[in-house]
Every structure is written in C-alpha cells, then in structure tokens.
C-alpha cells in the first residue's frame, strides 16, 4: 500500500470554508500525506506528517508561494496509536489564527513552530473542479503509509471535532 491512494474529481464548492477529518494510524514516520488537492507543483494544498521533525504540517501553495504554512511543535511518532485529525478552515475570519484550526484527538493545536496563515478571503484548491483531490498522496510521489478510517470533507462550514 506504499504507492496507492484514492482520488476524486472535485466539483465546484466553497473554497474558503470547509472541514476535513481523518482517523489514521501510522506504520512509518516517513513523510505521510493524508489529504491533498493538487493542481500543479505551484498550486496545491495538503496536510501531512513531515518526517524530518515528525510534526503535522498544513501547507498551501499558491503561485509557487506559501499561502499558508503551519508546523505543530508537538511530535507525532507513535505507530501504535490512532489519531483523529480535524482541519477546520474559514478564510473569511478577520483574525488570522481563526482561519485555520487544527485539532488532534479533540484538542486544538495552538503551538506552532511555523505559523503563516492565509490572507483573509483566500480561496484555495479544495472544492475546485480544476484539481484532483487525493486521499493518501500529494501528486504521485509522496504516499500515506498506515491505516486510515473515516475520511470526511464538509463543504461550507468550519466544524469543530
């Protein structure tokens, strides 16, 4: 399963407000992409486990620049544990830190080694009918290694766990 993933063609939807959720258990602490929307190398978004530091990372690329980048300070390297991660997004919020909320096992992550939030009203690749959404991969080179369950995306609302 090291090079397999699910893909779906997205339909036009709300590109500013949405929630993504996944339950997962790691089998490796290498780079792990959970959910991504990929247009090209300069325009994509994903959230994943970054292997160098074993931190969760939210990364949005727009025209080759980081439109958003969050790296947790907390480490995620327990291959025996199940994690529930919720990414709650609302770029219409006036306060930058409210535009992306990341929860792990019901607790909001508030400590980040890097915290670059998107501009207010930023639209990203999620719910864009010109991009492919992938569960378990970024493009065709970084794959999820583990077990995933109950992957969900909710359009138009920033839900809490």
Task: Give the label of every model feature segment.
Residues 2-59, 93-96, 157-161:
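Extracellular glycan-recognition modules
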Residues 2-3, 94-96, 101, 110-117, ...:
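Extended recognition patches within non-cytosolic domains
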Residues 8-10, 71-77, 122-123:
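Beta-strand-rich interaction surfaces with strong enrichment in secreted/lumenal proteins
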Residues 20-22, 80-91, 102:
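Short tryptophan-centered beta-strand motifs in secreted/extracellular beta-sheet-rich domains
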Residues 43-45, 65-72, 107-113:
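Surface-exposed loop/edge segments in extracytoplasmic proteins
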Residues 59-84:
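Short, aromatic/His-centered strand-loop micro-motif at the edge of beta-sheets
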Residues 104-131:
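Short, solvent-exposed beta-strand-to-loop segments that form ligand-recognition rims
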Residues 125-149:
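Extracellular glycan-interaction patches encoded by glycine-rich segments
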């Amino acid at each position: 399963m090291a090079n397999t993933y699910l893909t779906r063609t997205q339909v036009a939807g709300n590109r500013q407000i949405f929630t993504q959720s996944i339950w997962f258990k790691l089998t490796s602490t290498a780079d792990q992409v959970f959910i991504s929307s990929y247009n090209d190398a300069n325009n994509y978004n994903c959230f994943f486990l970054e292997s160098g530091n074993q931190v969760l990372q939210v990364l949005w690329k727009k025209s080759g620049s980081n439109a958003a980048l969050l790296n947790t300070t907390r480490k995620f390297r327990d291959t025996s544990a199940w994690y529930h991660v919720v990414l709650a997004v609302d770029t219409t919020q006036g306060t930058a830190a409210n535009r992306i909320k990341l929860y792990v096992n019901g607790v909001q992550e508030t400590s980040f080694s890097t915290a670059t939030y998107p501009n207010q009203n930023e639209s990203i690749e999620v719910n864009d009918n010109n991009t492919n959404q992938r569960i378990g991969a970024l493009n065709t080179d970084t794959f999820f290694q583990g077990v995933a369950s109950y992957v969900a995306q909710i359009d138009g609302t920033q839900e809490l766990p």
